[in-house]
Amino acid sequence: MKTYTPSRAPCPIARAARLLGDRWVLLILRDAFLGAERFEEFVERLGINRAALTSRLAMLQEAGLLRRDPPDSKRARYILTDKARALVPVFEQMAGWSSAHLFAEGEQAPQWPPASAA
């Protein structure tokens, strides 16, 4: 199981990469920003296996980005914390950069955040 161990690197990018550098972490946060809250929603949206999702959700809780509510329920919701919501501008910048540089000429990048999430 993945656990969160804060980086001791003096570089702020290295510290952020320690937490956010995992592909699943970014996609879980993306879907949480778009309204996913329950374990099954993340499984369905991401196609992630249950063990990987369980470990990433635990890691995001340890890091203070998600809160499980209620803590001991099998039907718990995973709620974004203020610390996680502070990442919205980072995701907006990442989406803008990707749209400008990773899509072929003439290829339309989806809007971020989607209009349905507004």
Task: Please tell me what each predicted stretch does.
Residues 44, 61-62:
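Alpha-helical residues within the helix-turn-helix
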Residues 88-118:
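Amphipathic alpha-helical dimerization/coiled-coil segments
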Residues 1-9:
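Long, low-complexity, charged/polar intrinsically disordered regions in eukaryotic proteins
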Residues 56:
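Residues within the DNA-recognition helix of helix-turn-helix
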Residues 21, 72-93:
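Basic, amphipathic "hinge/linker" alpha-helix immediately C-terminal to the N-terminal HTH DNA-binding motif
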